[in-house]
């Protein structure tokens, strides 16, 4: 049973193991709101997951520890379990979906855990972990549907109240619901007036779907850049806690998540993974009313592959009007390309990529299409460049 005493016990157990992460003021992210970021992306292993994993490990019996542990994860729980097992001298086997970022896979191995890659998503890794548990006798460490794990995550709430006792609202990412269950239970127990907002990826709204339907329905599929919260079904324990203590759940798109990752990098010099940035995305795009409030966004993790990061940055630039691609119909004659680039330069745009295609089906046989990528200041700047091109007779293709 989850109790506030258990959360305090977890805090004691984590002393000297998990960092007390900073709550950083972020005035530029959400004007009109006194917004703070709880930087669990700077936690040991790069996410909050060490808290729950380590506390769970301390609650195991000697017999369970001797058998070794097995866990399944989208990546961050894997690292938390691997490091916790290493610190306690326990064998750990981790089942990861084969689409997990390479950085998370390699980090898990670096802590000494045995990694088993499973085809599919988190739920497939979960089934494989249960199979190996039954075959080998390992102790299974659930990533979210476990009282001890939830209590460990709840220690974040104790720190938030210590750092910002006057906080009005807290925004928390949701995957399976372990993080928000621990935070919501603890905050509502100690300060019932606080508003708790859960944030899910639009492509993986398992908790929102379950609460709206009043049952633990399993999503047929999930698709999001926020791999850490790409979960098809919440747990029964997290479902019950969220139904009692969470005020509202909202969703954010992949484009909004990308914009949030970019904003965190530019304004706060922080790197967040997709799952870690959903709370900030909800604040940025006004998914909940935070005007005049003191609010905290839990940035739950920062383990993102640099290859994914580059794609996310490009997506974020497009979302914020800092980049655009124009398709321009040209006559196939000398000087046309020069004319286009000169107009763009005169308007202060910067060309980063050009593709010149000869006549294609449906176009003028004497024409060609120019696909050009620009760096711009904002959406108004893009419209200014488009208008200048059209005034000089160039035709833009939608």
Name each region found by the language model.
Residues 1-398:
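PLP-dependent amino-acid enzyme catalytic core
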């Amino acid at each position: 049973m989850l109790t506030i005493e258990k959360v305090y016990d977890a805090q004691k157990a984590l002393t000297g193991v998990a960092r007390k992460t900073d709550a950083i003021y972020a005035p530029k992210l959400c004007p009109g709101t006194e917004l703070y970021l709880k930087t669990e992306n700077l936690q040991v292993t790069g996410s909050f997951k060490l808290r729950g994993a380590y506390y769970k490990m301390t609650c195991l019996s000697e017999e369970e520890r001797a058998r070794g542990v097995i866990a399944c994860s989208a990546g961050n729980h894997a690292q938390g379990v691997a490091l916790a097992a290493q610190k306690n001298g326990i064998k750990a086997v981790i089942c990861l979906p084969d689409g997990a970022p390479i950085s998370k896979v390699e980090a898990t191995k670096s802590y000494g855990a045995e990694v088993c890659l499973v085809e599919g998503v988190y739920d497939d890794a979960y089934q494989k972990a249960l199979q190996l548990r039954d075959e080998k006798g390992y102790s299974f460490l659930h990533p979210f549907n476990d009282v001890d794990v939830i209590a460990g995550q709840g220690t974040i709430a104790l720190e938030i109240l210590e750092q910002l006792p006057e906080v009005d609202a807290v925004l928390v990412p949701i995957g399976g619901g372990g993080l928000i269950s621990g935070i919501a239970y603890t905050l509502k127990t100690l300060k019932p007036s606080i508003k708790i907002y859960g944030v899910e990826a639009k492509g993986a709204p398992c908790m929102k779907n379950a609460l709206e339907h009043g049952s633990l329905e399993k999503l047929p599929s999930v698709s999001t850049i926020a791999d850490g919260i790409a979960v098809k079904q919440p747990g029964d324990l997290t479902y019950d806690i969220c139904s009692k203590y969470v005020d509202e759940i909202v969703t954010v798109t992949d484009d909004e998540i990308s914009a949030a990752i970019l904003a965190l990098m530019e304004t706060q010099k922080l790197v967040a993974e997709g799952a870690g940035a959903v709370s900030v995305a909800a604040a940025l795009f006004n998914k909940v009313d935070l005007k005049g409030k003191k609010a905290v966004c839990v940035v739950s993790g920062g383990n993102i592959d640099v290859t994914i990061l580059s794609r996310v940055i490009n997506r974020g630039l497009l979302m914020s009007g800092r980049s655009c691609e124009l398709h321009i119909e040209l006559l196939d004659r000398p000087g046309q390309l020069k004319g286009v680039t000169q107009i763009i330069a005169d308007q202060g745009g910067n060309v980063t990529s050009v593709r010149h295609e000869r006549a294609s089906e449906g176009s003028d046989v004497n024409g060609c299409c120019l696909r050009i990528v620009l760096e711009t200041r904002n959406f108004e700047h893009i419209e200014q460049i488009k208008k200048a091109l059209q005034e000089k007779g160039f035709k833009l293709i939608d």
